[in-house]
């Protein structure tokens, strides 16, 4: 570590080749190179779609604000603490200082365009991250240099890894006490299971008080020292550059660190890239002589292949290190032309039962059909050999107070143009696309078109498009869609089951309509929010992903939307199920002489619905949301109905498929109304439709008649069973897989607390690194890679000792017992313990715990 003044003091805009060009405010290079009006016309090869992902409070929004400022998109830097950031624009976000909704924004940089999505870091909003990752080509993972790799970082990293998304790591908060760049790099290798190349490393200066101060970075690729002006009024644009090769005699320690970092980089890249080996041999086997262009190309190839992760460092809050990170986005992350082809299938709705007859509506199978895909080197993805076919995925819907419903989408092929016709392949409905927008946080910009590889917004769709819908268009050409095009399905977005409930009710009857309207808006925006109604209590039950999730929902209802409502505390989401099979049939009928009727029976199962034997039966329909199954037995459909179809005597206004769907929907409604003992929705339950009748030659009855009788039949069966055999029903509770990360000296006390207070079942206790498949590789890799000294960790001679001293406890825990666990864990571990949870499934509540839960809800 060297105390030095700058050799060259220049105010410049950092570029990947370190050209020295003016970067003073008012002479914005990005604006000069790429005007705002031309931003939307940037070709796909100069476009990047990135997400900012991390654990909460790692600095995602702070980093994004600097990117906006340095690109010339904003005139001042927003501050999370002051609540004036561009991407956190919801009142709840600004009040709490956290990101709740992912926000999209587009910036220019080095004649390129970067579409950025800033995602939440709190575990309750993981679904926001999940649906954002579906439309991203790459991501920047931000890590807190003090905390290292945290639980949520590990979780979202694995999500991105499963999708094959290339990543860059940015070690933030290097200015903080206790910041450990090298320790964090070791954790990246160990916990995230990735090779790394250090593209820059921290630079420290030691003033007279002998406390190291983070001042800049050593650029390993270009062999330069970049030092930022740290005056209180500096905004990060005043940077001095020192050429370490020219000044190696004056700065031998810095030069040696860069040399060792380069050597490690070349060794890592050379394991998979022969061009590096060739260049090394051509340059006298001197690591420092390998050209920057050769290294850049190799790093990009390795990043795109998920072979390596480029690592950068900085302090976004202190305006240090962000510009090199932005260059890395352009240099190392893929354009839409370089990313992998998305998962696309052609898929139409499936008929509920096999039927014959010329009059029935024809439906294709639900089995995915291969779709011809190719990548045009200039325009990008081409689907079904049709370069004029536009496809887009709707990944987010919001309701703006003045602009109405706004649907965020990613265009995958073709060009989406305003004033043309689009089709929603889920509904088959055609819509007139009037206006297209690009979003700048909360501010829209109207554009005439949005081309492949870009993210935009459609306004004015109301309820016609929801999250996960695929949109197709032929652009200005008004031609019909063929069967394959009209049933395309892109990148299905899985919605996790809600785990917490909270009840809400209007203060007066006059407040009901407005409250219901507000709830519908929230449901449209957030597919992870579920709503049901307790008819006995007259309460609306909101179900969400966590306590904070529901608290934010309630805040939005009452504070933002001005709904007059009474709110209850957040509680765990329980379910009911049959404790044992019940083969007793129940018949329900209506109309003259029972001409509309149904016969059903009920059963139950353990585990996931799709894995049960019931799911393999003919006519089985799996209801994934509540893990239920409805079986419409093939023999249940009356023969006279099929005869009426064959002989063209079908007089009903409804097709046979519509009638069958009504039967199923009636069953679904009844199951959601709740069980007879606890009043919770039924789960892991089978409804078997054994027989049903409907007068096909009558105009007096419709599909609603069938929906009503199936609902009443299931409701009656549940009620009768509850009155005659209360013990037949069991209470189910959510069980979580919990991972607790601690130091070994806290192991005994934490295990005791988990098993006694949390009622946990311990499944394993290991060294933290032993949970990784490639333990030996991770240890060897972290030992092999050069990392610079951590000046804030002088007493740690062997970082491996610290890593190996950490334990991970894996346990299955009832969710109810984990409420408030974090504060207890921190108390036990002196603030060093952390944990994360993932949903395993629903399990029957054991008798020893049933009484306390029953008392909580005033049962029995």
From Swiss-Prot:
Family matches, as InterPro entries: EFG2, EFG_II, EFG_III, EFG_III/V, EFG_V, EFG_V-like, EFTu-like_2, G_TR_CS
Domain tr-type G span(s) in chain numbering: 45-337
Annotated residues for binding of GTP: 54-61, 118-122, 172-175
Predominant localisation class: mitochondrion
Compartments (UniProt record): Mitochondrion
Recorded coiled-coil stretches: none
UniProt keyword list: GTP-binding, Mitochondrion, Nucleotide-binding, Protein biosynthesis
Gene Ontology biological process: mitochondrial genome maintenance; mitochondrial translation; regulation of mitochondrial membrane potential; ribosome disassembly
Keyword Nucleotide-binding carried by entry: yes
GO CC, alphabetical: mitochondrion
CDD domains reported for this sequence: EF-G, EFG_III, EFG_mtEFG_C
Gene Ontology MF term list: GTP binding; GTPase activity
Origin: domain of life: Eukaryota
Annotated SUPFAM superfamilies: EF-G C-terminal domain-like, P-loop containing nucleoside triphosphate hydrolases, Translation proteins
Further facts: This protein may be expected to contain an N-terminal transit peptide but none has been predicted.
Entry's family note: Belongs to the TRAFAC class translation factor GTPase superfamily. Classic translation factor GTPase family. EF-G/EF-2 subfamily.
Function: Mitochondrial GTPase that mediates the disassembly of ribosomes from messenger RNA at the termination of mitochondrial protein biosynthesis. Not involved in the GTP-dependent ribosomal translocation step during translation elongation.
Name of the protein described by the UniProt record: Ribosome-releasing factor 2, mitochondrial
């Amino acid at each position: 570590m060297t105390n030095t003044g700058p050799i060259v003091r220049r105010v410049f805009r950092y570029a990947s080749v370190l050209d020295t060009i003016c970067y003073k405010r008012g002479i914005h290079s990005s604006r000069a190179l790429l005007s705002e009006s031309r931003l939307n016309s940037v070709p796909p090869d100069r476009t990047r779609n990135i997400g900012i992902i991390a654990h909460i409070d790692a600095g995602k929004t702070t980093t994004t604000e600097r990117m906006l400022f340095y690109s010339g998109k904003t005139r001042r830097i927003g501050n999370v603490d002051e609540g004036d950031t561009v991407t956190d624009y919801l009142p709840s976000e600004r009040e709490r200082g956290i990101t709740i909704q992912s926000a999209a924004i587009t910036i220019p940089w080095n004649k390129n365009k970067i579409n950025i999505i800033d995602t939440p870091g709190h575990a309750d909003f993981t679904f926001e991250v999940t649906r954002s990752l579906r439309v991203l080509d790459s991501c920047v993972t931000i890590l807190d240099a003090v905390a290292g790799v945290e639980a949520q970082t590990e979780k979202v990293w694995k999500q991105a890894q499963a999708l094959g998304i290339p990543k860059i790591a940015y070690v933030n908060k290097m200015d903080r006490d206790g910041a450990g760049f090298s320790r964090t790099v070791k954790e990246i290798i160990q916990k995230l299971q990735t090779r790394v190349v250090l593209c820059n490393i921290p630079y420290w200066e030691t003033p007279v008080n002998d406390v190291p101060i983070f001042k800049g970075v050593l650029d390993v690729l270009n062999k330069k020292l970049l030092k930022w002006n740290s005056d209180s009024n500096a905004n990060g644009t005043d940077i001095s550059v020192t050429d370490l090769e020219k000044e190696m005699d004056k700065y031998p320690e810095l030069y040696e660190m860069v040399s060792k970092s380069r050597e490690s980089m070349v060794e890592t890249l050379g394991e998979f890239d022969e061009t590096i080996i060739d260049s090394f041999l051509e340059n006298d086997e001197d690591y420092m002589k390998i050209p920057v262009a050769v290294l850049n190309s190799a790093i990009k190839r390795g990043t795109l292949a998920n072979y390596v992760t480029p690592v950068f460092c900085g302090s976004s809050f202190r305006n240090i290190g962000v510009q090199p990170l932005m260059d890395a986005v352009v240099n190392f992350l893929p354009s839409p032309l370089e990313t992998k082809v998305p998962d696309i299938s052609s898929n139409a709705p499936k008929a509920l039962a096999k039927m014959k007859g010329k009059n029935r509506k024809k439906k294709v199978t639900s089995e995915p059909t291969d779709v011809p895909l190719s990548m045009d080197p200039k325009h990008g993805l081409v689907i079904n050999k049709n370069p004029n076919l536009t496809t887009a995925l709707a990944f987010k819907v919001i309701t703006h107070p003045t602009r109405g419903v706004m649907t965020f989408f990613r265009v995958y092929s073709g060009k989406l143009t305003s004033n043309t016709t689009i089709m929603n392949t889920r509904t088959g409905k055609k819509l007139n696309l009037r206006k297209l927008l690009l979003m700048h946080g909360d501010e829209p910009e109207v554009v005439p078109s949005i081309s492949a590889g870009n993210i935009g917004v459609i306004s004015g769709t109301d309820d016609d498009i929801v999250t996960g819908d695929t949109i197709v268009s032929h652009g200005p050409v008004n031609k019909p869609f063929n069967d394959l095009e009209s049933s395309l399905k892109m990148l299905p977005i899985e919605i996790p089951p809600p785990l917490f409930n909270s009840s809400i009710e209007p203060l007066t009857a006059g407040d009901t309509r407005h409250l219901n309207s507000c709830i519908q808006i929230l449901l449209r925006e957030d597919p992870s929010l579920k709503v049901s109604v307790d008819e006995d209590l007259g309460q609306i039950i909101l179900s969400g992903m966590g306590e904070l999730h529901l608290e934010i929902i309630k805040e939005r209802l009452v504070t933002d939307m001005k709904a007059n409502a009474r709110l209850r505390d957040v509680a765990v989401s329980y379910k009911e199920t049959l404790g044992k099979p019940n083969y007793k049939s129940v018949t329900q009928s209506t109309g003259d002489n029972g001409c509309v009727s149904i016969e059903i029976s009920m059963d139950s199962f353990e585990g996931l619905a799709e894995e049960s034997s019931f799911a393999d039966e003919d006519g089985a329909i799996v209801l994934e949301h509540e893990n239920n199954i409805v079986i419409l037995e093939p023999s249940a459909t009356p023969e006279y109905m099929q005869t009426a179809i064959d002989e063209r005597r079908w007089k009903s206004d409804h097709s046979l498929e519509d009638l069958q769907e009504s039967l199923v929907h009636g069953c679904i409604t009844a199951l959601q109304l709740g069980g007879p003992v606890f009043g919770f929705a039924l789960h892991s339950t089978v409804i078997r439709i054994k027989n049903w009748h409907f007068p096909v030659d009558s105009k007096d009855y419709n599909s609603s008649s069938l929906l009503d009788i199936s609902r009443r039949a299931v409701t009656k069966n549940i009620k009768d069973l509850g009155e005659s055999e209360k013990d037949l029903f069991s209470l189910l509770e959510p069980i979580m897989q919990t991972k607790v990360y601690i130091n070994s000296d806290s192991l005994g006390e934490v295990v005791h607390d988990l098993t006694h207070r949390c009622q946990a079942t311990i499944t394993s206790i290991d060294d933290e690194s032993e949970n990784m498949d490639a333990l030996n590789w991770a240890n060897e890799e972290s030992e092999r890679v050069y990392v610079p000294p951590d000046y804030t960790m002088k007493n740690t001679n062997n970082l491996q000792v610290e890593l190996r001293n950490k334990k991970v406890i894996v346990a299955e825990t009832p969710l109810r017992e984990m409420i408030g666990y974090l504060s207890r864990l921190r108390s036990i571990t002196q603030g060093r313990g952390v944990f994360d949870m993932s949903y395993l499934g629903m399990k029957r509540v054991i008798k020893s715990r049933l009484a306390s839960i029953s008392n909580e809800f005033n049962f029995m």
